[in-house]
A protein has these predicted regions:
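Charge-dense, low-complexity intrinsically disordered segments
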Residues: 1-2, 126
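A non-catalytic, amphipathic alpha-helix used as a structural packing/dimerization or gating element
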Residues: 2-13, 134-141
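FAD-binding core/adjacent interface of flavoenzyme oxidoreductases
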Residues: 5-94, 165-169
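A Rossmann-like FAD-binding core segment of flavoenzymes
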Residues: 21-24, 28-41, 110-169
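Glycine-rich Rossmann-fold phosphate-binding loop(s) that bind the pyrophosphate
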Residues: 94-97, 127
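N-terminal Rossmann-fold NAD(P) dinucleotide-binding loop
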Residues: 100-101
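Short hydrophobic alpha-helical segments of the AMP-binding
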Residues: 107
Length: 169
């Protein structure tokens, strides 16, 4: 929690330093107007504003697998993975999207043996092919194990940990 707070405070400091106004809530672009865009911000401090330049921070939410619930003890979301107090010996990450790769990379650099399981047959399929190739090389160099084209089977919890059964499609 302290690390996340420190990062958030650092971002808010950079906003202030660069004269960026921060609005917390959900935003919707209503229409283009003279001087920029009309934006409706909903939430605790709802308001409509006009801005010439806008940064949209989309946040992130982990997508659960059908029949698998995040208990934040053994089966972790990205939020739970950031709250772990000790480096796990082994860690399995399901999905090689931005969140999965970030979590896997962080824990690998901290010493965990990390395997990333991806259902797609290609690495970072939505990204430019050359960028994906270079990213794959960087992750391989870190020691991140990436399995592509896998089908996730049973996920079982026990006192010793979690077992993820998977097959190569």
């Amino acid at each position: 929690d302290a690390i996340v707070k420190q990062n958030n405070d650092g971002i808010l400091y950079l906003f202030k330093k660069n004269k960026v106004t921060f609005f917390h809530g959900r935003g919707a672009f209503n229409k283009a107007v003279e001087g920029g865009y009309e934006i409706q911000v909903t939430g605790k401090n709802a308001e409509t504003l006009v801005a010439k330049q806008v940064i949209v921070a989309t946040g992130s939410n982990a997508r659960p697998l059908p029949g698998v619930e995040f208990d934040e003890q053994q089966i972790l979301s990205n939020d739970g993975a950031l709250a772990v107090n000790a480096v796990p010996k082994k860690l399995g990450v399901i999905g090689s999207g931005v969140i999965g790769l970030e979590m896997g990379s962080v824990w690998r650099r901290l010493g965990a043996d990390v395997t990333v399981l991806e259902g797609m047959p290609t690495f970072l399929a939505a990204v430019d092919e050359q960028v994906a190739k270079e990213a794959k090389k960087a992750f391989d160099k870190q020691g991140l194990k990436i399995e592509l084209g896998v089908k996730i089977g049973d996920i079982k919890k026990s006192k010793k940990g979690v077992t993820v059964a998977y097959t190569n499609a």
